[in-house]
Amino acid sequence: MMSLHTAMLVGLLAPLVVAILTPFLAVRHVWRDAAGPIGGVITFIAAVHVALAVLDGETPRLFVAQIAEGLALEFAVTPLGAIFGLVASGLWILAALYSVGYMRGNHEKHQTRFAAFYAVAVHAAMAVAWSGNLLVLFVFYEILTFSTYPLVTHKESALARNAGRLYMSILVGTSVVLLLPAVVWVWLSTGTLDFRPGGYLAGQIDPAMAPILLALFAFGVGKAALMPIHRWLPAAMVAPTPVSALLHAVAVVKAGVFTILTVVVYVFGIDFLAETGAADWLVWLSAFTILASSMVAITKDDVKARLAYSTISQLSYIVLGAAIASSIAVQGATLHIVMHAAGKITLFFCAGAIYVQAHLTKISELDGQGREMPWVFAAFFIGALSIIGIPPLGGSWSKFMLMVGAVDSGYLVILGVLGLSSLLNIYYLLEPVSRGFFRPKVKTVEVTSHPLVVIPPVLTAILSLLLFFYVDFFAALAKLMVIS
């Protein structure tokens, strides 16, 4: 049995080792393609070991260097970090397998470069998850941005380069102009950047200034895709579908909402936010983003574009839970990181599988195609039901807890927002399924079988189902997060 110190080293370094070895393993494509899934399994085992220790009340730590008095380069795993680490490492296994099938099926160029940067992105996500303070989080948040740029621009077309410029300008711009000053503000006000249970800003900053500091964090974390800092996400859909899965489920956007939740719980403290009302404005902005992005999603005929706006909406569920700042709402937001990851990666896997097997990208082209690709469309159906929040799928737990949190905190209007959002979700997520299974075929295409792009979405769809029945482990970590 490995020690916690060893487990943390393995969890942080295994993806980096995969990235370094990938160019050398490319002499045999099968070696290169096996490195990602194997690295994912190793990283996930380490993440499970660390998460179990956190559940037992420990705080696994890995000290690297002392930078200044009260400021260290250190990793320390919180219950929230343990959850994000499990999501990032666990889904990397299936995403790596899927990437092999997708890249081979489409005969994509630069597959070695793609696999290497994919692993670097997972390394950065794990470091963000296990960061011990705001400095470490900020550094690896930036590394995650830069490591995903080559993935977004992978096709090297003019459209991809334009998307890459927008991606970098928004994510780097917001982090440097807004997030970094917020981190400096916390340091100057408190003399520390550590994460502490219950937060520590109460009594350290003027309550009247708390909404401004929170705004710097909320908009500085561009990866959370709050409106109007959201345009990078739909633009990034020009990337190959495995990148979309990485952006939407495994690493990038989850790093964004993870950062906001971390700041709310471990820096501000939910009691401080609730007592001062400093996050009230964020509740309403999140509600607006939830509905506005859902309405935009309805207008999109491109499958990935529709899913992109769905992601913007679902991310704001998590921000909403953080902003409500009650125990049950924060737990619901935390669980939604897990549930949305499983459901949304299923949907993107299915979108990519349809493209690889039939070269279809438009919802209007899917009429009758469900009978040609039943496993893919069935997986899409299950993933959609989880995102909508219908039992017995995992997404129903997190949405239920968010609704309870809204009512308990007196936000009755938010209950209506969540209900309306679910109705909109039903419309725009189930349309591809209804077209695929229940409409006559309008376009005859040759469907080629590619098991490596079909098996992963089926497995993640099953995961979305299992998460409904086996939610206790994640729920216990989420509860520990707000009572520790």
Give the location of each predicted region.
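Cytoplasmic/organellar membrane-interface segments at the starts of transmembrane helices
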Residues: R371-V376, I426, L430-S484
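Hydrophobic transmembrane alpha-helices and their helix-loop junctions in integral membrane proteins
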Residues: L94-T112, Y118-L137, S147-R435
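Alpha-helical transmembrane segments and their helix-start/interface "positive-inside/aromatic belt" motifs
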Residues: V30-G40, N162-V172, M373-F377, P451-V458
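Transmembrane helix-loop-helix hairpins at membrane boundaries of multipass inner-membrane proteins
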Residues: M1-L9, I20-A116, G191-Y200, T262, ...
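Membrane-interface helix-loop-helix modules in multi-pass inner-membrane proteins
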Residues: L55-E58, L62-G85, L134-L137, Y141-V152, ...
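Small-residue-rich transmembrane alpha-helices that serve as helix-helix interface/gating elements
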Residues: L12, M339-A342, G419, T460, ...
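Hydrophobic alpha-helical transmembrane segments of integral membrane proteins
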Residues: G11-L12, A19-I20, D33, L178, ...
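Hydrophobic alpha-helical membrane-insertion segments
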Residues: I38-A51, G173-A182, G383, L459-F469
